[in-house]
Amino acid sequence: MQYKSQNFSHSQNPKTGVLLVNLGTPAAPTAKALKPYLKQFLSDPRVVEFPRLLWWLILNGIILNVRPRKSAAAYAKVWTERGSPLAIHTADQASALNVRLQRRFDDQVVVAWAMRYGSPSMADVQQSLFDQGVQQLLVIPLYPQYSAATTGSTFDALSADFQRRRWLPALRFVNQYHDNPGYIAALAERVRQHWQNNGRADKLILSYHGVPLRYLHAGDPYHCQCLATSRLLAEALQLTESEVITSFQSRFGREEWLQPYTDVLLKQLPGAGVKSVQIMCPGFSSDCLETIEEIGEENREYFLQNGGENYQYIPALNAGEDHIDVLEQLVLDNLQGWSLAPTAKRELEQRQQRADSCPFNQTKKL
């Protein structure tokens, strides 16, 4: 195997990198852009655990000939002048976090963001970080609840890139923060602010992205962590079990997924006497297609068409100050024990001199 070379210099000041990773987005709201994005996403065996040959036939023979056009129409509804909402919010989160960390560590800590699927790719962003002298890397997948299909897949991509590199950084990886006190407090404050401006509804629905039920039976902790987040958030808001409902959205295919399904639930609630609902998606660190269009529009119609009277979506934390507080504390907690002080200029010069004088140094470049 040909390993990637590292542009290393003894005179370069070693830095620490913080990499925020989210799921991904197409380059444009068009069928042409959606096809390669969906192919990369749905080809991931972590996302679709199905016999590979059979799935390849289904994906390439049916799905990629039908779904890109349909998905493009949905993306077009949420696209902005700056691009995809998910990319915008993730970039803003990284920028705000970088400002916070610059105040603490000057330029010793570098913050970047990447997407698991699409652009900017993890491999490209990691290369950029290493080119800047990053020798310690903290990776934070922006999924509060762990699932093999999201956080696990992020680690797969990280590992695949590392397998091609000659030199590897010191590595730390945040695999979940579903019960992080700051995260729960930020969610609770977002709900309280909404209540202050809009009053309370009959029910607060906490909708998470669904996964097939068999993932739970195979040991994936996602379902348990979603329920834990809901319980802690309800406690923070002093709500009873009857006032909060946890549900799961965005199911794909015909097999059974985690229930109750959000869309089915919203069709049924008006018949049970629930005329007003407020819905939040705690598993989404940023608003995106699944929250803006699916929850904000599509599921609103289901509720109102079946007799509901008042439907309100509570936005994600996005790049709000309280969310940046959470991310900053996650970083500080996970950087403990690593050296973050800049290396003295004199020490760097001495390192370079020793390297230059080493008899085994043929190139004199290290």
Swiss-Prot record:
Binding site for Fe cation: 209, 290
CDD domains in the cross-refs: Ferrochelatase_C, Ferrochelatase_N
EC category: lyase
Keywords, sorted A to Z: Cytoplasm, Heme biosynthesis, Iron, Lyase, Metal-binding, Porphyrin biosynthesis
Gene Ontology MF, one: ferrochelatase activity
Function: Catalyzes the ferrous insertion into protoporphyrin IX.
Native source species: Teredinibacter turnerae (strain ATCC 39867 / T7901)
Recorded metabolic or biological pathway in which this protein acts: Porphyrin-containing compound metabolism; protoheme biosynthesis; protoheme from protoporphyrin-IX: step 1/1
Protein's recorded name: Ferrochelatase
EC annotation from Swiss-Prot or TrEMBL: 4.98.1.1
Reaction catalysis annotation: heme b + 2 H(+) = protoporphyrin IX + Fe(2+)
Family: Belongs to the ferrochelatase family.
Chief location: cytoplasm
